[in-house]
């Protein structure tokens, strides 16, 4: 017979293994990553966020290098989420509420290829959902939407001062309106 401590440890190990399998990830470029990160941090089921640079062609870029628009990178948020609480389809629909999908290389006052919008996936298993949401969004516009849909080629974490920027600097610059953060905080994936 096992002791209560061993049974509890066994339960916790099994529970943690199950929880790990429910953790999924997606990379979203929605203009300036400060606001995009803060927006997604408000959504129930988002476990963690990390800002950085995706799908460029240099190694270990700095913010100053990316800012030149000579590296091919997009400011991007790496999002880990609990699939039991929030699904990819919900997150993508929330993403489209926070961007102007018709704007090429610009969101708000921020302009340049680093501010382009994109969905960068880590598994082909994500494509059916991504394609569905893209088709629904495209149906709303007469011209093609300007949102990239590509596999993630690379991602480099941005410097520490960019991480959780709007938490550390509540009055800092953001291209997204405050009301959008309130909306995200109240939003819930009702399919879960």
Task: Label every model-predicted segment.
Residues 6-192:
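Flexible coil/turn and secondary-structure edge motifs
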């Amino acid at each position: 017979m096992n002791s209560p401590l061993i049974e509890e440890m066994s339960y916790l190990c099994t529970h943690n293994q199950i929880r790990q399998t429910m953790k999924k990830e997606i990379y979203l470029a929605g203009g300036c990553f400060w606001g995009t990160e803060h927006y997604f941090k408000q959504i129930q089921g988002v476990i963690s966020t990390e800002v950085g640079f995706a799908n460029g062609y240099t190694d270990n870029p700095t913010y100053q290098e990316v800012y030149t628009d000579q590296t091919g990178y997009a400011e991007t948020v790496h999002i880990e989420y609990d699939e039991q609480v929030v699904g990819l389809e919900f997150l993508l629909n929330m993403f489209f509420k926070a961007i102007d999908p018709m704007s090429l290389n610009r969101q708000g006052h921020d302009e340049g290829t680093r501010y382009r919008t994109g969905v960068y996936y880590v598994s082909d298993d994500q494509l059916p959902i991504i394609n569905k949401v893209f088709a629904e969004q495209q149906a709303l516009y007469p011209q093609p939407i300007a949102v990239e849909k590509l596999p993630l080629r690379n991602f480099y974490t941005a410097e520490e001062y960019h991480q959780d920027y709007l938490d550390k600097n509540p009055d800092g610059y953001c291209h997204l309106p405050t009301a959008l953060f309130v909306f995200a905080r109240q939003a819930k994936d009702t399919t879960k």
